[in-house]
A protein has these predicted regions:
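N-terminal helix-cap/turn-to-beta initiation motif at the start of protein domains
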Residues: 25-41
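Sec-dependent signal peptide recognition
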Residues: 2-7
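Sequence-level preference for short, compositionally simple segments enriched
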Residues: 19-23, 48, 67, 141, ...
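C-terminal motif of bacterial Sec signal peptides marking the signal peptidase cleavage site
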Residues: 14-15
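Glycine-rich, aromatic-bearing surface loops/beta-hairpins
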Residues: 140-174
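Amphipathic hydrophobic-ligand
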Residues: 55-61, 134-139, 163-165
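A short, Trp-centered hydrophobic/proline-enriched beta-strand micro-motif
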Residues: 38-46, 153
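Central antiparallel beta-sheet cores of small beta-barrel/beta-sandwich binding domains
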Residues: 45, 49-130
């Protein structure tokens, strides 16, 4: 019983650690305005790592965004190194200077986005196809602008609060 209580307290303590927040970047530059950066053509290259850090897949992607003044329509085409091709269309609405909401056909509910300084955080649950079934994976997705053309993306993927994979992506705007 003492071991169980000790383990519970350790898990509780780990869960209470300070996580990175979008507002941590509010005074940093360059400022990432996601609807500007993703408007037009953007190329991306990424690697998917399993929970132990092993690279399991790689991709190249083409993104094309159109901003109408209040919403961004973002078309993504992923070409994976195993031959799989995936497409996704995001509709991202700007709520105010710092807050966004997004939807896509394989996103459960609504994604929440937060933009401060060079950082954009996107939180959502994605239906990921695995062996013929869709499983719900929670994404903690961060994009960091490096300069006017280059941004780096890190996404942590979890199931039941446990990390199952990480995604690293480099974006280059045409």
């Amino acid at each position: 019983m003492k071991k169980f209580i000790g383990l519970f307290l350790l898990i509780l303590l780990i869960g209470c650690t300070n996580k990175m927040k979008p507002t941590d970047f509010k005074d940093q530059k360059p400022r990432l305005v996601i609807e500007n950066y993703l408007s037009g053509n953007v190329k991306a290259w990424g690697v998917l790592q399993n929970r132990s850090g092993k690279v399991t897949r790689q991709f190249k992607a083409d993104l094309n965004g159109k901003w109408d003044g209040s919403k961004l329509i973002l078309d993504e085409v992923f070409n994976w190194n195993d031959g799989e091709r995936q497409t996704r269309q995001w509709t991202i609405n700007k709520l105010d200077e710092h807050n966004y909401e997004g939807t896509a056909s394989d996103v459960v509910g609504t994604a929440k986005g937060y933009s401060y300084g060079p950082a954009f955080k996107f939180e959502y649950v994605l239906l990921v196809p695995v062996k013929g079934k869709n499983i719900k994976i929670t994404f903690d997705d961060w994009i960091f602008m490096q300069d006017e053309r280059v941004a780096i993306n890190r996404a942590t993927m979890t199931k039941f609060g446990i990390k199952v994979a990480e995604l690293t992506v480099m974006f280059v705007k045409d």
